[in-house]
């Protein structure tokens, strides 16, 4: 590298490193929305397979009484409720509402609270 190129390269702005970056609610919820979407695809596939097997063998149906399976089903319910609520939030964004920083933060927390409440409503 020539001396001029080296000087230009050294003066370029650098991006903040991840260790000093504070995650925001919007970025965290965006990543969580993608993760729940992928997880729901696989979990629904497994649930359909499990339901088909339980039709032919009652032992698979007895698995639903296991505590670990119940915890997994509650986690699945939360992921589904979260993905639903955040999808509704995205629909409002698609029509042009809620793009201010304040609105994004408020609706983000509303999505988290509503998904918890919906999950509790499903299991109580």
Curated annotation (Swiss-Prot):
Instruction: From the UniProt record, give the pathway where this protein acts.
Output: Carbohydrate metabolism; tricarboxylic acid cycle
Biological process, per Gene Ontology: tricarboxylic acid cycle
Task: Please describe what this protein does.
Answer: Membrane-anchoring subunit of succinate dehydrogenase (SDH).
Provide Periplasmic-side residue ranges.
56-67
Q: Which gene encodes it?
A: sdhC
Q: How does it sit in the membrane?
A: Multi-pass membrane protein
**Stated name of the protein:** Succinate dehydrogenase cytochrome b556 subunit
Q: Name the family the entry cites.
A: Belongs to the cytochrome b560 family.
Report the superkingdom from the record: Bacteria
């Amino acid at each position: 590298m020539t001396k001029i190129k080296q000087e230009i390269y050294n003066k370029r702005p650098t991006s903040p490193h991840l260790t000093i970056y504070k995650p925001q609610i919007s970025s965290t919820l965006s990543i969580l929305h993608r993760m729940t979407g992928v997880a729901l695809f696989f979990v629904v596939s497994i649930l359909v397979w499990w339901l088909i097997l339980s039709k032919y063998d009652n032992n698979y149906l007895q698995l639903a009484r296991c505590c670990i399976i119940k915890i997994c089903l509650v986690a699945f319910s939360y992921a589904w409720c979260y993905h639903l609520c955040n999808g509704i939030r995205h629909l409002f964004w698609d029509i042009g509402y809620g793009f201010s920083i304040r609105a994004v933060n408020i609706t983000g927390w509303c999505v988290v609270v509503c998904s918890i409440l919906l999950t509790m409503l499903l299991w109580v």
